[in-house]
Amino acid sequence: MRASLIEAQIREQKLKDEQDFYRIHLSIDAQEDIDKLLRFAKECHSQQPLRKLIWSEYFLKPFGEMAGRILGKDKISGIYKITNIKDGKIYIGQSTDIKTRWSNHIKAALKIDSIAHSRVHDAMGEEGIWNFTFELLEQCPKEKLNEREKYYIEFYQSNIYGYNKTVGGA
């Protein structure tokens, strides 16, 4: 247990020191364009085409670069953390394919054919996706995902102070 605590503290300090490594890189101009387009989308009868355009033109390539830096090219099963760098709130999740899951989180924040919408998606949409870091906490096989997700939600208390609604493992 103590080793896990020390490992998590070291990882947290490294994340703060190397925050840009774990973020989607967008220029200020791109961020401003996205904000304008999302405001405009709210006035449109059919928002999906514009939101899909924002994904494909502004996020797809930078997302691929970020995911490649963090995960490499292989399909990764494990536990991940999404952190709001403005307020420090976090979300802990699990997936048998983390890259695809992260992509789905971003699309949900953009309100594109979304998975179940959640507090982390609302925050990403309001604060700007570029203000969130994506981190792989642990690789683990499918049969260990629930157990390890519960561990990290309890460790970070993200169901109390973050975006998780439950203690996880479902």
Model-found features: residue ranges?
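Structure-specific nucleic-acid interaction/processing domains
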Residues: 11-15, 21-44, 49-170
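N-terminal mitochondrial targeting presequence
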Residues: 1-6
